[in-house]
Amino acid sequence: MINPNPKRSDEPVFWGLFGAGGMWSAIIAPVMILLVGILLPLGLFPGDALSYERVLAFAQSFIGRVFLFLMIVLPLWCGLHRMHHAMHDLKIHVPAGKWVFYGLAAILTVVTLIGVVTI
């Protein structure tokens, strides 16, 4: 018999943020590390492609703020989701683990939002 009132899970929301963060970490973050962490210090960019003024102007634009927000928040959710499930897999029971890890991710998301908005 089918239960007419099944218990709903909040896990799909967290899996969605985990998946988005994993994709962002796998595709966008390595490119940014290559560009800003390796090519820029070696002087392999033409002229003032990433001068301070241009980077600041980008960071203060709407698209730049969204990019910075996603660059910080999505890998954060992915990492904390992994930590939550790693603790579960290792049988290390954190009291109210879901609240600890996802709550921390939510708090850091709000802190990041405040930081990005006030650039």
UniProtKB/Swiss-Prot annotation:
Part of an enzyme complex containing four subunits: a flavoprotein (FrdA), an iron-sulfur protein (FrdB), and two hydrophobic anchor proteins (FrdC and FrdD). Induction: Regulated at the transcriptional level in response to the cellular availability of the alternate electron acceptors oxygen, nitrate, and fumarate. One of its GO terms (cellular component) is plasma membrane. Gene3D superfamilies: Fumarate reductase/succinate dehydrogenase, transmembrane subunit. Residues 36-60, 116-119 are periplasmic. Belongs to the FrdD family. It is found in: Cell inner membrane. Two distinct, membrane-bound, FAD-containing enzymes are responsible for the catalysis of fumarate and succinate interconversion; fumarate reductase is used in anaerobic growth, and succinate dehydrogenase is used in aerobic growth. Anchors the catalytic components of the fumarate reductase complex to the cell inner membrane, binds quinones. The QFR enzyme complex binds 2 quinones in or near the membrane; 1 near the [3Fe-4S] cluster (QP is proximal to the [3Fe-4S] cluster, on the cytoplasmic side of the membrane) while QD (the distal cluster) is on the other side of the membrane. HAMAP family: Fumarate_red_D. GO terms for biological process: anaerobic electron transport chain; anaerobic respiration; bacterial-type flagellum assembly; fermentation; fumarate metabolic process. CDD domains: QFR_TypeD_subunitD. This is Fumarate reductase subunit D. It holds the Pfam family Fumarate_red_D. SUPFAM superfamilies: Fumarate reductase respiratory complex transmembrane subunits (SSF81343). Residues 1-8, 90-96 are cytoplasmic. GO terms for molecular function: succinate dehydrogenase activity.
